[in-house]
C-alpha cells in the first residue's frame, strides 16, 4: 500500500554499516578498533584495521570497510533478558554475565583483539543504548545530552562503576535516573552483562561511546557510497513503432503522394 520496498540485511552488512557510522570516532593513533554493536537480538563485534581506514579515507571505507574479522553473537538485550526473566535480577545478573562470557569466548577472533588491547594499540567503540546510558550515568547528566555523550571515553573502571550503581539501585532506582527512565530500565542489566563480558575479554580496552551506528552508516552509504547504474531507458529510435503509428504514417504518405 505504501509503495516502499524493504530489504533485510545480513549480520555482516550490519557490522559493515555500524563501522561506517562510527568511522570518525576512531582515534588517530589507533592500529585497530573493536566496534561493539549491541542490539535487541544479537551483538555484532567488528575488528577493524584502523590504519587502513585512515589510509583509504572515507570513500575507501564506503567501498570496502577494512574489517579484519567479525562475528554476530546470539546475544541481545531483549533475548538475554527474556532467557532469565524467571529469576530475580539479583540472581539473574551473574548468570547473564556468565552466559555472555561463554558466548564471546567462542569467537576465535577474540584472542587477537585481547592481545592488541594489551599492547595499547587498539580501543573499542560501543554503539548501543546500553553504552550511551552508561556514559550518561558516569557523567552524572541531569538529562540525556548527545553532545556530551557521543565521543566520550569510558575506561573499564568507570564503566564497571556505572554498572555497579545500576545494579545497586534496582529497577525503581534505574527508572528515576534521568538518562535511563522507564523505557530502558528493564533492559539495562542484560545490556550491562554484555558490556561487562566484553571488558572481561579485553580488560585493557578503553571504550569510546557512539550515539550513532547502523542507521548513520546506512544513510552515509546511501548518500556517498558507490552508485548502482540505473537501467537505460530505450530512446524513441529504439522503440518498435506501434500499428497505430505505422498506419498513420502510411496514410500520411499516401496523402502527400496524391
Summary of predicted features, one role per range:
Residues 1-32, 47, 55-57, 64-244, ...:
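Helical "lid/coupling" subdomains associated with nucleotide-phosphate turnover
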Residues 245, 250-251:
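Short, charge-rich patches within N-terminal targeting peptides
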Residues 40-47:
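Acidic, divalent-metal-coordinating active-site segment for phosphoryl/phosphodiester hydrolysis
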